[in-house]
Amino acid sequence: MVKIRLKRAGRKKMPFYQIVAADGRAPRDGKFLEVLGHYNPTAKPHTVTIEKDRVAYWLNVGAQPTDTVHSLIRGTGLLHEMNLKRRGLSESDIAAQMEAWRQKEAERRQKRLNAKLRRRQAKKAAEAAGSAEG
């Protein structure tokens, strides 16, 4: 079975991954069929670059993405776009829905970032209050 998975590269403590199509029996960093993109988890924010047409091809011929790769592909909107095409929508409808999806996804990311900043500020305030008392 062909799997779409991550192949580790980079140096020690600085991982960088290639997204590859590989035989499921091959080792993680072993033989692969095709490079489909890359993922850099150490960048802030992390970066994902995929070749959408090739990933779509491999998914259509039955390749199974691993859980991590599935979430990375889902984050790019490719799975949503493939689902819209499968439902038989016109190109203009797909483009409109994808634009709405991108806006909603940007709002979600901004909301998560704001929540993270609020938690960080609350923690700093609590530490400052604790050090002022003690």
UniProtKB/Swiss-Prot annotation:
Keywords: Ribonucleoprotein, Ribosomal protein
Stretch list, region Disordered: 115-134
Coiled-coil boundaries: none
Gene3D superfamilies per the UniProt record, alphabetical: 3.30.1320.10
PROSITE patterns for this protein: RIBOSOMAL_S16 (PS00732)
Highest taxon of the lineage: Bacteria
GO molecular function, one term: structural constituent of ribosome
InterPro entries: Ribosomal_bS16, Ribosomal_bS16_CS, Ribosomal_bS16_dom_sf
Transmembrane segment boundaries: none
A GO-annotated cellular component: small ribosomal subunit
GO biological process, one term: translation
Family: Belongs to the bacterial ribosomal protein bS16 family.
Cross-referenced HAMAP family: Ribosomal_bS16
Protein name, per record: Small ribosomal subunit protein bS16
Gene: rpsP
